[in-house]
Curated annotation (Swiss-Prot):
Gene field: rpmJ
Protein's recorded name: Large ribosomal subunit protein bL36
Keywords: Ribonucleoprotein, Ribosomal protein
GO MF: structural constituent of ribosome
PROSITE patterns (UniProt xref): RIBOSOMAL_L36
Membrane-crossing residue ranges in chain numbering: none
Region (Disordered): 1-45
Highest taxon of the lineage: Bacteria
A GO cellular-component term linked to this record: ribonucleoprotein complex
Species in which this protein is naturally found: Chlamydia trachomatis serovar D (strain ATCC VR-885 / DSM 19411 / UW-3/Cx)
Matching SUPFAM superfamilies: Ribosomal protein L36
Pfam families from the UniProt entry: Ribosomal_L36
Keyword Nucleus: no
Record-level GO BP terms: translation
Family as reported in the entry's similarity comment: Belongs to the bacterial ribosomal protein bL36 family.
Length: 45
């Protein structure tokens, strides 16, 4: 899964933007290698 500060989804390639637990994810059932997550604030210890 790619993690970057700014993610873009391409619906023509099967990408879907999903918000889970306050983070943005790109999921793709056709091509699972296109998974992405938007980097948020660092985790609290």
């Amino acid at each position: 899964m790619r993690v970057s500060s700014s993610i873009k989804a391409d619906p023509s390639k099967g990408d879907k933007l999903v918000r889970r637990k306050g983070r943005l994810y790109v999921i793709n059932k056709k091509d699972p290698n296109r998974k992405q997550r938007q980097a948020g604030p660092a985790r609290k210890k």
